[in-house]
Amino acid sequence: MNLWTKIFQPPCHIKEISDPELVKKQYKYWRMRIFYSMFLGYVFFYFTRKSFTFAMPTLIADLGFDKAQLGIIGSTLYITYGISKFVSGVMSDQSNPRYFMAIGLIITGISNIFFGLSSTIPLFVLFWGINGWFQGWGWPPCARLLTHWYSKSERGTWWSVWSTSHNIGGALIPVLTGVAIDYTGWRGAMFIPGIICIIMGFILIDRLRDTPQSLGLPAIEKFRKEEDAHPHEETTADILEEEAERELSTKEILFTYVLSNKWLWFLSFASFFIYVVRMAVNDWSALYLIETKDYSTVKANLCVSLFEIGGLFGMLLAGWLSDTISKGKRGPMNVVFSLGLLVSILGLWGTRDYFVWWIDGTFLFIIGFFLFGPQMMIGLAAAELSHKKAAGTASGFTGWFAYFGAAFAGYPLGKVAQDWGWHGFFVALLACALIALILFLPTWNASEQSLRKHSH
C-alpha cells in the first residue's frame, strides 16, 4: 500500500448500529460536527485565496506593478484552481475528505507564507499557482460530505447555509488584510492568513470524518426513510443501501455520470460567465472605487465586504426557495436571480457620478445577493443531477469552467480596464450576466427524473 492510498483511502464501512435511538443520537451529533468543521474549514480557505486580492493596491504602490501584471498573478491562481477543482473532484470521490480537505488547507497556508517572502513576478506566479492547485482541494470533499450526510429534501437549505462560508470568509479577509497592511505591510497580510490556515488544517484532521457508513450509521436515505434516488438508481431503501456500499470506478464517474450529462454542460458554461462577474466584482471593485471616487482602502474594502454579505442572504434565500417554491428544482431560481444580477450591475454603473460610499455599497450588496444564489446552486444542481458517488466530480466539473471564468476576470479584464477604462469593464460584465441568463433557461425543468428519461 503506497503512502497516498494509506492517507487518502476512504475508511471501510463498519457494522451498522442496531439501536434506533443510538443511531438517531449519533446522526444528530455527527451531522452538526461535520457541518461546522467543513464550514469553518472553507471560511479559512478563503483567507489564503483572497489575501492577495486585497493586498493589490499596496503591491502597486510598493513594488510598482501595473494592473496587467497583477492580473497575470490573479489569473494563474484561477487557472490552476479551475484545473485542480475538476481533477481533485475525481480524486476526492475516491478519497477520505478528512485528510483531503485538511492537507489542502495546510499547503495553501504554506504557499501564502512563501508568497509573502517573495518580491518578483515569477516567484509570485509560482507560489500563487501552487496555492491555486491546493485551493481545489477544499470544495470537492465538501460536496461529497453534503451529499452523504444530507438528503434530497433538505439539501438545498443545508447546501446554501454551508455556502455562506464563501461570504463569511470573503467578508472577513478584507478586514484582516486591511488591518495587517496598516500595521505590518502587505507581507504581513500574506503571513497571518497562512499561519491561521495551517493551524486550522490540523483541526480539520481531528474533527472531520467520511461517510455515515464508516461510523456504523445507515445511509442518509435509509435513515430519513426517503426515496432519495439519483439518476440511474432504483429507489428502494435496500438498493440505495447496496449502492452506497459500492464505490464507482473513475471511468464510470467520468463517462457515465459526468461527461455524457447534458445538464452539466449547460451549468458549466453558465458557471463560466457567472464567475467572470463574481471575480471581477470581488477583485476589481475596490480598485475601481479607489481610482474613480478616491475612496480610502478601508472604505473601498468595506463596500466589497457588503458584496459578500449580500451574497450570504442571497444564497440562503435561493436555497430555501428552491427547496420549497421550486420543489427541489434549482433552474427557476437560477433564471430569476440571474435577471436580478443583470439589472443590479446596470444600477452600480449608473451611480458612477455619485461619490457616496453607501450608495456604492448598497448596489454591491444587491449584486452579491443576486449573484451568489446561482453561483451556489450550480454546484448543488450538478451534484444532484449526477450520481451520489460522483458528486465531487460533477461539482468539480462545473468548478473547472467556473475558474476559467475567474481567470478571465484576471488578466483579460485587467487589460480591458487598462485599455478601455471602467466603461469597457462594465460592458463586459453586463454581457457575461446576459449570457449566463440565456444558458440557465434550458435548465428550468431539469431534474433527476428528466435526466433519467433522457438517458434511457
Swiss-Prot record:
Major location category of this protein: membrane
TM regions (residue ranges): 34-54, 70-90, 113-133, 161-181, 185-205, 257-277, 302-322, 331-351, 363-383, 394-414, 421-441
Molecular function terms from GO: glucose 6-phosphate:phosphate antiporter activity
Keywords assigned: Cell membrane, Membrane, Sugar transport, Transmembrane, Transmembrane helix, Transport
Subcellular location: Cell membrane
Membrane topology: Multi-pass membrane protein
GO CC, one annotated term: plasma membrane
Role description: Transport protein for sugar phosphate uptake.
Similarity remark: Belongs to the major facilitator superfamily. Organophosphate:Pi antiporter (OPA) (TC 2.A.1.4) family.
Classification via NCBIfam families: 2A0104 (TIGR00881)
PANTHER family: GLUCOSE-6-PHOSPHATE EXCHANGER SLC37A4 (PTHR43826:SF3)
Protein's recorded name: Probable hexose phosphate transport protein
Source species: Chlamydia trachomatis serovar D (strain ATCC VR-885 / DSM 19411 / UW-3/Cx)
